[in-house]
């Protein structure tokens, strides 16, 4: 193990993300992009194994906006999809643009309705809090005539 601040595995719920071989790079990108985010542990292979060698990074523990995550370098077997995404609530247009541009500008791709994917294929929803507040409030209820 190269680095260990503390482990996320003490949390009751940790998001586990599968990467081909770039879990450490992705974790460092997330830690550098979002506040309250950091890499907390990097675990290396103790010896050679099928498809890898001693010292290869196997897992990386990190947080994204305080949410504990672990990235696994599991090879190309599984890919990320829109079935899972991080939804990031933003408080200003500047914050929305900053996160969007960081993700898309680092090899990611744009999608519709505030969705984008990072260069590792993980989906993100960069959502202005004003939008989610308005959706939660709903439209005014129509008045219904009372019945006798």
Q: PLM features: residue spans?
A:
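Short, Lys/Arg-enriched N-terminal segments with co-localized hydrophobic residues
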Residues: 1-8
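Residues that flank catalytic or metal-binding motifs in active/ligand-binding sites
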Residues: 11, 56-58, 82
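Short loop/turn microsegments at loop-to-beta-strand junctions
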Residues: 14, 57, 111-113
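Short aromatic/hydrophobic contact patches that present stacked aromatics
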Residues: 14-16, 59, 85-87
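Core segments of cupin and vicinal oxygen chelate
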Residues: 17-66
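Vicinal oxygen chelate
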Residues: 19, 23, 33, 64-68, ...
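Gly/Ser-enriched beta-turn/beta-hairpin loop segments
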Residues: 53, 77-78
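A short, polar/charged loop-to-alpha-helix boundary motif
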Residues: 130-147
């Amino acid at each position: 193990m190269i680095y260990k601040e503390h482990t996320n595995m003490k949390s009751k719920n940790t998001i586990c993300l599968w990467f081909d071989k770039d879990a450490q790079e992705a974790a460092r990108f997330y830690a550098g992009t979002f506040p309250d985010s950091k890499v907390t542990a990097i675990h290396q292979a103790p010896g050679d194994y099928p498809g890898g060698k001693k010292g290869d990074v196997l897992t990386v523990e990190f947080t994204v906006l305080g949410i504990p995550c672990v990235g696994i370098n599991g090879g190309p077997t599984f890919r990320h999809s829109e079935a899972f995404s991080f939804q990031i609530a933003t408080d200003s247009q500047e914050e929305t643009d900053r996160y969007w541009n960081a993700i898309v500008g680092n090899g990611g791709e744009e999608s519709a309705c505030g969705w984008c994917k990072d260069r590792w294929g993980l989906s993100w929803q960069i959502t202005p809090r004003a939008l989610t507040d308005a959706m939660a409030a709903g439209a005014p209820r129509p008045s219904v005539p009372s019945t006798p």
